[in-house]
Amino acid sequence: MARLAGVDLPRNKRMEVALTYIYGIGPARAAQLLEETGISPDLRTDNLTDEQVSALRDVIEATWKVEGDLRRQVQADIRRKIEIGCYQGLRHRRGLPVRGQRTKTNARTRKGPKKTIAGKKK
């Protein structure tokens, strides 16, 4: 089982799919990474050689922030917006949608379960 960026990649999946198990690497970045290292996207994870694994590891570490570093960066960005008091920071603080979605109806994921108000009948 190959281990990249602190993540165990699934054994029987194609490399193109297996790389997306790493936080910060989606389908497009996985394809770009395989092209840079010269590894076939159709190759299965358990067929990787040690040289290929080290090549992937080197490119990932040199090029992008992934996993813990990326998660810390995102959290720090959110914390900074909250501290400076910008609109997005206020929305984060109040637990409401940040990117301009409507909240009169919907937005239940951010707002949590519906709170019923007593005495609101016809």
Curated annotation (Swiss-Prot):
GO terms for biological process: translation. InterPro entries: Rbsml_uS13_C (IPR027437), Ribosomal_uS13 (IPR001892), Ribosomal_uS13-like_H2TH (IPR010979), Ribosomal_uS13_bac-type (IPR019980), Ribosomal_uS13_CS (IPR018269). GO terms for cellular component: cytosol; small ribosomal subunit. Residues 95-122 are annotated as: Disordered. The keyword tRNA-binding applies. Keywords: Ribonucleoprotein, Ribosomal protein, RNA-binding, rRNA-binding, tRNA-binding. Gene3D superfamilies: 1.10.8.50, 30s ribosomal protein s13, domain 2. Pfam families: Ribosomal_S13. PROSITE patterns: RIBOSOMAL_S13_1, RIBOSOMAL_S13_2. GO terms for molecular function: rRNA binding; structural constituent of ribosome; tRNA binding. Part of the 30S ribosomal subunit. Forms a loose heterodimer with protein S19. Forms two bridges to the 50S subunit in the 70S ribosome. Located at the top of the head of the 30S subunit, it contacts several helices of the 16S rRNA. In the 70S ribosome it contacts the 23S rRNA (bridge B1a) and protein L5 of the 50S subunit (bridge B1b), connecting the 2 subunits; these bridges are implicated in subunit movement. Contacts the tRNAs in the A and P-sites. Belongs to the universal ribosomal protein uS13 family. This is Small ribosomal subunit protein uS13. The lineage of its organism: Bacteria, Bacillati, Actinomycetota, Actinomycetes, Mycobacteriales.
